Amino acid sequence: MMDKETAKHRAEELRRTIDQYSYEYYTLDEPSVPDSEYDRLMQELIAIEEEHPELRTPDSPTQRVGGAVLESFQKVQHGTPMLSLGNAFNDDDLRDFDRRVRQAVGDGVAYNVELKIDGLAVSLRYEDGYFVRGATRGDGTTGEDITENLKTIRNIPLKMKRNLSIEVRGEAYMPKQSFEALNEERLKHEEEPFANPRNAAAGSLRQLDPKIAAKRNLDIFVYSIAELDEMGVETQSQGLDFLDELGFKTNQERKKCATIDEVIEMIEELQAKRADLPYEIDGIVIKVDSLDQQEELGYTAKSPRWAIAYKFPAEEVVTKLLDIELNVGRTGVITPTAVLEPVKVAGTTVSRASLHNEDLIKEKDIRILDKVVVKKAGDIIPEVVNVLIEQRTGEEKEFNMPTGCPECESELVRIEGEVALRCINPECPAQIREGLIHFVSRNAMNIDGLGERVITQLFREHLVRNVADLYKLTKEQVIRLERMGEKSTDNLISSIQKSKENSLERLLFGLGIRFIGSKAAKTLAMHFESLENLKQVTEEELLAVDEIGEKMADAVITYFRKEEMLELLNELEELGVNTLYKGPKKVKAEDSDSYFAGKTIVLTGKLEELSRNEAKAQIEALGGKLTGSVSKKTDLLIAGEAAGSKLTKAQELNIEVWNEAQLLGELKK
């Protein structure tokens, strides 16, 4: 068991590493490491945060859904978030999941077991039975519009068998045979082959020319409808049958299991079939079958509590460690990275792995030119498991961390209680550059077209030294950069100007205040409403805000007491950057005179005038509390079409029931 201080610094390192790997995987489609390493690091971080809940931060990768939208396609907002799943790695993890489920909903639980297809998660929107829009998962809330490419997949019906307006979720993939044929063709034309079928599928669906996607023989399995409970369907297994009836292709390697023991048996059966399947799978998905029980279990910020993904055991290979490189992050932390002799692990070429810190290198006695064991459990991140000391030849070289920053040569320091070495020079080019990249990122100021490549050029040409300089850029300066034409320059200048209108929480997150992630930034912006108020805030006022702890409060106070930070913020204001919160304000029940104020409300069935999320937001803005299941504590059920079992239960408990017209009437008051 780690002491709190060690755990704190390990958690910080894990968050940084996981965020970087998430960016490589979800944004660039160029994962540098396999799933196994990513999963291992995530499990380690989850364990630390469970052991020390006070170390859990709002911006931790365990709290969010990771991934940003590329610039090549239009952005699409998902009606219902496309969340990721928690992971199980062994039978004990599955039994723990089962225990949590039964503690929440009782013993009458059945599970639906399905294959986890290794492809690209997509959302298909149908209006009156017609396919109108397809999108990638993206960051779970916002994806990319790839409608024209998805239309080339023959198993996606352009017209359903019923005139429904629904959002269908599925996994687009490339069959093994198509993948092999594609790579043979690429090699014939002296093009680089794809590392695995998933990368090939993702790359195909992100082609701007749909004709390219059409040639690549992609396929799809669908697995859910976002509005399933509005279709009069009561279980996940019925939902899959319903999708079959509508003309979609679902995976038939599935089974409804009455107990977790049956689930484990089914997993063993499916795992034995893995090599013979005509497509790649990277695990098995286990879902609570009852939709009512799913609603009762609900969600964390990152994943549903009613489903889990069983991940296959790790694969290990031996390769040579060629060098150790050092990277400087935006907070000055120096992270060593292993440069490996490229090696294939489960279909992916691995050439780099994070070594986290100097202590880990010493603990494992890792030397340059060592033969090392690299582990991969899935497809994202690699880990150097251990060194093959018995294979040393004498040419290996010990690695020693430098005393100076690899970027600016300033003296490196180890802050008391921290594992990492830091560069504390505020003028360090690497820190400034990384800070600029963070400022323009998806969850911060979200400036389209201003990615790492352009930021690096702007910095190298001395056109920007801080975030305020971004708002001083001219068309003449930008168009001279590499690969920047007239149109891309105009679009970039327009995006920069548009970002001035962002709500305060985006600016706060973009400033990179330590411990303040996107969620904490939203909380602060909502509570204090303006940057001016935050400049004058006291520690007592900060600690009075829900979800703001001592570390966060101290970081905010420290930031707003620095003269150079205040000068930067004043400059941003003078340049026209908005410093006010523009979002909806939380309403306390006692401050609302609405009928909904203080009431516990359940929504069920399909609403015609509003989406479920719109209705929920408006009810909560009037002081109502939304829950997923009907109980004696429920004050009101609002029933749309095909309300199903929730309506029956509400009537049995004599709970007040409204229709959509009554809801709209109250909202208009």
UniProtKB/Swiss-Prot annotation:
It comes from the Bacteria. Zn(2+) binds at residues 405, 408, 423, 428. Its EC number is 6.5.1.2. GO terms for biological process: DNA repair; DNA replication; regulation of DNA-templated transcription. It catalyses: NAD(+) + (deoxyribonucleotide)n-3'-hydroxyl + 5'-phospho-(deoxyribonucleotide)m = (deoxyribonucleotide)n+m + AMP + beta-nicotinamide D-nucleotide. The active site is at 116 (n6-amp-lysine intermediate). One of its GO terms (molecular function) is DNA ligase (NAD+) activity. Residues 591-669 form the BRCT domain. Its cofactor is Mg(2+); Mn(2+). Pfam families: BRCT (PF00533), DNA_ligase_aden (PF01653), DNA_ligase_OB (PF03120), DNA_ligase_ZBD (PF03119), HHH_2 (PF12826), HHH_5 (PF14520), Nlig-Ia (PF22745). DNA ligase that catalyzes the formation of phosphodiester linkages between 5'-phosphoryl and 3'-hydroxyl groups in double-stranded DNA using NAD as a coenzyme and as the energy source for the reaction. It is essential for DNA replication and repair of damaged DNA. This is DNA ligase. It comes from Bacillus velezensis (strain DSM 23117 / BGSC 10A6 / LMG 26770 / FZB42) (Bacillus amyloliquefaciens subsp. plantarum). The lineage of its organism: Bacteria, Bacillati, Bacillota, Bacilli, Bacillales.
